């Protein structure tokens, strides 16, 4: 069965979430990323795409670039822009795009489930991209980009999500592309760990 665990997240202070929020690192090229961070000192792209802070002639895979991602994450935390959970948590994340609504559980998955094929793969990945993100994780000591997993409908998990989404939100804002983002902190993180133990497999959708 699938192993899901709560975790201590590093997340934006509530009043800074819009300033930090950024698109995934791999949906734009470097020039587009440079444009996106202009006038935005707290954009998360300064952590996920730190090459934007270097001259265009600088090697984007240089040691200094990866070091900058670590330095910027530390700066965001030191300046209070981002906070660290004191206790392990599970989050519920909802995106609303026009008439389309999707809701997910934000938690940690286990590497053993990937190795033992309880997390199902659907495509090959490029080694250069794997190496880049692996080094980024090692340098920052953080997973800065989530993996999107799907699982078959489960009534127990649905009930937990329904209960948590009736509570107060942690974040509720709309990004420049018109997508509404809503996040709740679960009041029963252990219940998700127990519920996912009955899920036979997850499927990689993206990440």
Language model features with spans:
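A cross-family signal for N-terminal binding/gating loops and helix N-caps
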Residues: 1-206
């Amino acid at each position: 069965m699938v192993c899901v665990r709560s975790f201590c997240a590093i997340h934006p202070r509530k009043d800074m979430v819009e300033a930090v929020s950024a698109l995934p690192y791999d949906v734009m090229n470097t020039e587009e990323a440079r444009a996106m961070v202009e006038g935005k000192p707290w954009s998360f792209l300064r952590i996920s795409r730190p090459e934007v802070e270097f001259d265009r002639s600088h090697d984007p895979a240089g040691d200094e670039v990866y070091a900058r991602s670590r330095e910027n994450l530390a700066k965001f935390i030191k300046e209070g822009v981002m906070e660290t959970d004191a206790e392990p948590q599970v989050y519920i994340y909802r995106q609303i795009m026009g008439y389309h609504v999707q809701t997910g559980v934000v938690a940690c998955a286990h590497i053993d489930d990937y190795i033992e094929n309880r997390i199902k793969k659907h495509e090959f990945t490029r080694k250069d991209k794997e190496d880049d993100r692996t080094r980024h994780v090692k340098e920052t000591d953080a997973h800065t980009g989530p993996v999107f997993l799907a699982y078959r409908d489960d009534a127990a998990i649905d009930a937990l999500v329904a209960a948590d989404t009736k509570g107060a939100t942690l974040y509720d804002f709309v990004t420049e592309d018109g997508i509404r983002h809503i996040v709740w902190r679960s009041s029963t993180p252990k219940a998700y760990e127990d519920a996912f133990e009955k899920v036979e497999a997850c499927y990689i959708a993206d990440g």
